[in-house]
């Protein structure tokens, strides 16, 4: 009988200890909320994209000054791409990485498209006459139609462990980060010209950046250490 009482006491203490541990483990600390109040945040945050160090697309005098002697060179580079055929990356190009280890078959058209989009953006910023807008629209639209901006060599980090993009899961790598940044700049500078043609393209760009970059970065457990570092939580 005594042994039974001792056993019950032991189990009771163990259970209470476990509950206490769980309560402490899941206590909300809210470090960021305690670090600053609303008034402090209003003084610290830079709103309405005032942090952008570049002039508006329509400020031609500023862009002429910024481009300087490079203006004509950038325009000429864009002119070579006015008839550029945006390259489709087939499923087999992604699969080639897991079949043979060859990543270039996917990266070659991927890099060509991204470089073309970048060159067209710089050309339009340099000239400002709208000649490159349609091709920029084509490139941005094509980019939004891709299932992923991640390189095939990095896609095995998906839950599927395969090198073909899985629409059910978005991950981030250096390639997708760079592509997302480029798309963000294209949207920032040319949203109004795009909207005059069709506002759907700007909506697609924002949707693609949110789903492929912002959401996985903010929600994935694997990026917690980066978010903590950037928000100062380690302090």
Predicted features, each with a name:
Residues 26-98:
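Low-complexity, Ser/Thr/Pro/Gly-enriched N-terminal "stalk/linker" regions
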Residues 86, 102, 109-136, 144:
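Short, solvent-exposed loop/edge-beta patches enriched in aromatic
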Residues 224-231:
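Conserved small/polar residues in nucleotide/adenosyl-binding loops
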Residues 98-102, 152-169:
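Acidic/His metal-coordination segments adjacent to aromatic residues that form catalytic metal sites
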Residues 100-111, 166-174, 232:
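Short, solvent-exposed segments of well-ordered alpha helices
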Residues 1-27:
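Bacterial Sec-dependent N-terminal signal peptides
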Residues 78-89, 136-154, 201-223:
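Long, well-ordered core segments of solenoidal/helical folds
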Residues 115-130, 178-197, 233:
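Well-ordered alpha-helical scaffold segments within catalytic/enzyme domains
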């Amino acid at each position: 009988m005594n042994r039974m009482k001792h056993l019950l006491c032991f189990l009771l203490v163990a259970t209470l200890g476990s509950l206490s541990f769980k309560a402490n483990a899941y206590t909300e600390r809210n470090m960021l909320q305690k670090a600053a109040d609303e008034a402090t945040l209003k003084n610290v945050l830079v709103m309405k994209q005032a942090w952008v160090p570049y002039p508006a697309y329509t400020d031609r005098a500023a862009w002429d000054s910024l481009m300087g002697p490079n203006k004509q060179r950038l325009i000429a580079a864009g002119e070579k791409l006015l008839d550029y055929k945006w390259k489709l990356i087939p499923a087999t190009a992604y699969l080639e990485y897991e079949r043979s280890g060859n990543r270039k078959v996917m990266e070659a058209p991927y890099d060509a498209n991204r470089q073309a989009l970048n060159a067209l953006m710089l050309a339009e910023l340099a000239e400002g006459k709208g000649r490159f807008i349609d091709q920029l629209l084509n490139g941005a639209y094509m980019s939004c139609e891709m299932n992923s901006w991640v390189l095939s060599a990095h896609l095995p980090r998906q839950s599927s462990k395969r090198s073909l993009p899985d629409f059910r899961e978005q991950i981030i790598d250096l390639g997708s980060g760079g592509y997302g940044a480029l798309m963000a700049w294209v949207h920032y500078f040319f949203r109004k010209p795009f909207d005059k043609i069709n506002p759907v393209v700007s909506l697609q760009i924002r949707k693609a950046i949110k789903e492929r970059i912002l959401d996985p970065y903010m929600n994935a457990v694997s990026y917690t250490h980066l978010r903590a570092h950037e928000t100062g939580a380690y302090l």
